[in-house]
């Protein structure tokens, strides 16, 4: 029988293989030592390792370090979790099991409530399935076959009726199968370690009027070492939980009287305002104009912007659907742009807004400062011509790099390109994507491409931040928008006097101020960067109130507190150190007589020594590298 030979480009090689060869065959034949491969891409598309190669192609072997491959690994693990739940709870009806930012979950309709006491047996059942090394086999079934297979599962039936035309795929491992488009890892044995993390309730389709389900969260890894490292980080994260630190530093609290809306105490308000003032100073340098827009708009605005049709469930609607609290600033900025006539000379127009936003998050999803209903963003919208897009994006990237550099955060960039459903022409999209790619290239910022994941209104750059605990968090966003200017009929006059439609660049760097405060707290713990800390200096008073007052006046530019609680000197110093103060200044009789101050640097547990009061500011300036390696000492006066 005639064998068709194909060329497969892989890394720096071009392989000749027989038609029908699979990526797994190639892995075994040419890369036997690559034990870390869990998935693959064929011509840029994630595929099963068992997919037959039918034409010349480019093959990429993917590891757990790749975002897409990791999602595939966790999606496959969700199938194993579903299999275990069906084995343990015979009446269980599986609903939905996607990968998430950290692991995966499965929603299940089951009679018996699942609790933390069940985690161990669920893990044990999953390990049994993993050890059996079942292959993930893709099987095509007709719509009728699927409806018959899930006749007792109304939730799956809903998905079939809504999403399946004539046929769809299921993935089988052993006797278990689940409806899924894939792709998946090769077998359950690729999974080497599992941990059930938590469980909660969840509504079907996130609708409180529909069935209540049980949601089980878990995480898996392709090696036990990775799991050990993850659990160690989790323990560190517990100690650095921003809710715990926020309580200990008197920063903020939450109340049942306003779920999802934070009460910022004086210390927290200082930190909040310092972040905003830091950005305001940068806005002035970078040509942004800060504006204030209303918090509440009539629903006509949200109809015009398209948010009422596509975002209503996340909005707070009041007065019989007449008004709504704004969940984002862009429609208000469009109204502001439209209010005045603009020529090409006015562009780019960079509008920044710290307005309060509200989003109607489900109560079960609210989590400290990271998921709230009321928040503020460092939100900005740049109105520009198409020819200005690249330079404006470069400016956004430089701004982003500067701000994240201030906190020592690393980040990654991903260019998300034209999706299947999009507005505008292909040529318009191609030029916009090229402008974004060129901006990143010219900024010497490497990036990956996430094909087809752009918003329907324009391509975007997704920015993933790496915090001090190694977690990946998306805060910043840079998005091009062709649609909103058209919906609001925004115009400017070009050099020929012709009316043109501008492009909008949506841009946020910190994202939610609340969420960024949580990230900062969990990255630095109580020892915050000096410039942003609400507790910069503690003056330990040993019975010299007059001299303490003199010291306070000299250090008035800093945020300081006096510790005068009647305890011994060592206990007062200990109180100052454990309360997060960067500098501890001891003021006693000896210091008062010599007109000196004794300074202790908390971060390195180092005694700086005795200095004359008149020299203290110069000495602190000399210490600026250690005091705060992020910003020079003169930055600490941003917010007093």
Swiss-Prot record:
Family named by the database record: Belongs to the class-II aminoacyl-tRNA synthetase family.
GO cellular component terms given for this protein: mitochondrion
The protein's name in its UniProt record: Probable threonine--tRNA ligase, cytoplasmic
Chain coiled-coil ranges: none
Annotated organism of origin: Encephalitozoon cuniculi (strain GB-M1) (Microsporidian parasite)
Lineage start: Eukaryota, Fungi, Fungi incertae sedis, Microsporidia, Unikaryonidae
PROSITE patterns: AA_TRNA_LIGASE_II (PS50862), TGS (PS51880)
The keyword Aminoacyl-tRNA synthetase is annotated on this UniProt entry: yes
GO terms (BP aspect): threonyl-tRNA aminoacylation
Cited InterPro entries: aa-tRNA-synt_IIb, aa-tRNA-synth_II, aa-tRNA-synth_II/BPL/LPL, Anticodon-bd, Anticodon-bd_dom_sf, Beta-grasp_dom_sf, TGS, Thr-tRNA-ligase_IIa
Subcellular location: Cytoplasm
């Amino acid at each position: 029988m005639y064998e068709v030979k194909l060329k497969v480009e892989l890394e720096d090689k071009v392989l000749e293989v027989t038609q029908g060869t699979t990526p797994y065959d190639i892995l075994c034949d040419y890369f036997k030592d690559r034990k870390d491969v869990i998935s693959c891409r064929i011509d840029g598309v994630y595929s099963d390792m068992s997919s037959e190669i039918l034409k010349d192609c480019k093959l990429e072997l993917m590891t757990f370090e790749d975002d897409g491959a990791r999602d595939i690994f966790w999606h496959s693990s969700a199938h194993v979790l579903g299999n275990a739940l069906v084995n343990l709870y015979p009446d269980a009806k599986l609903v939905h099991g996607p990968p998430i930012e950290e692991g995966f979950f499965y929603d299940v309709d089951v009679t018996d409530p699942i609790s933390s006491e069940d985690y161990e047996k669920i893990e044990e059942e999953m390990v049994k399935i993993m050890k059996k090394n079942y292959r993930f086999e893709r099987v095509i079934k007709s719509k009728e076959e699927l409806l018959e297979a899930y006749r007792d599962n109304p939730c799956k039936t809903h998905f079939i009726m809504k999403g399946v035309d004539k046929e769809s795929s299921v993935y089988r491992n052993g006797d278990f199968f689940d409806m899924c488009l894939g792709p998946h890892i090769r077998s359950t044995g690729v999974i080497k370690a599992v941990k059930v993390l938590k469980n909660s309730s969840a509504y079907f389709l996130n609708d409180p009027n529909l069935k209540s389900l049980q949601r089980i969260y878990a995480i898996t890894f392709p090696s036990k070492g990775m799991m050990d490292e993850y659990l160690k980080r989790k323990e560190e994260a517990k100690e650095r939980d921003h809710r715990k630190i926020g309580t200990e530093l008197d920063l903020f609290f939450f109340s049942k009287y306003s779920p999802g809306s934070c009460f910022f105490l004086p210390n927290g308000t200082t930190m909040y305002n310092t972040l905003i003032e830091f950005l305001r100073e940068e806005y002035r340098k970078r040509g942004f104009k800060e504006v204030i827009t209303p918090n509440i708009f009539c629903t006509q605005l949200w109809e015009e912007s398209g948010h009422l049709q596509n975002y209503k469930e996340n909005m707070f609607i009041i007065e019989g659907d007449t008004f709504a609290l704004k969940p984002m600033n862009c429609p208000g900025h469009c109204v502001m742009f439209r209010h005045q006539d603009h020529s090409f000379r006015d562009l780019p127009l960079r509008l920044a807004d710290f307005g309060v936003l509200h989003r109607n998050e489900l109560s079960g999803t609210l989590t400290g400062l990271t998921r709230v209903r009321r928040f503020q963003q460092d939100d900005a919208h740049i109105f520009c011509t198409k020819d200005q897009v690249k330079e404006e994006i470069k400016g956004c990237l430089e701004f982003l790099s500067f701000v994240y550099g201030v906190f020592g955060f690393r980040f990654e960039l991903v260019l998300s390109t034209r999706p299947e459903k999009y507005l505008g022409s292909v040529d318009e999209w191609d030029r916009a994507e090229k402008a974004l790619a060129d901006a990143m290239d010219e900024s010497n910022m490497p990036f990956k491409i996430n094909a087809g994941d752009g918003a329907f209104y324009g391509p975007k750059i997704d920015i993933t931040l790496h915090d001090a605990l190694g977690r990946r968090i998306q805060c910043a966003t840079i998005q091009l928008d062709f649609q909103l200017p058209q919906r609001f009929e925004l115009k400017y006059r070009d050099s020929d006097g012709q009316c043109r439609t501008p492009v909008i660049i949506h841009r946020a760097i910190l994202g939610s101020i609340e969420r960024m405060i949580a990230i900062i707290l969990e990255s630095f713990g109580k020892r915050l960067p000096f410039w942003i800390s609400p507790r910069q200096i503690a003056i330990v008073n040993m019975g010299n109130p007059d001299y303490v007052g003199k010291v306070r006046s000299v250090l008035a530019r800093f945020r300081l507190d006096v510790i005068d609680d009647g305890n011994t000197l060592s206990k007062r110093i200990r109180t100052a150190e454990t309360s997060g103060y960067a500098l501890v200044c001891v003021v006693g009789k000896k210091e008062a007589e010599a007109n000196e101050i004794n300074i202790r640097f908390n971060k390195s547990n180092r005694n700086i020594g005795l200095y004359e009061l008149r020299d203290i500011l110069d000495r602190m300036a000399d210490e600026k590298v250690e005091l705060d390696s992020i910003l020079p000492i003169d930055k600490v006066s941003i917010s007093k």
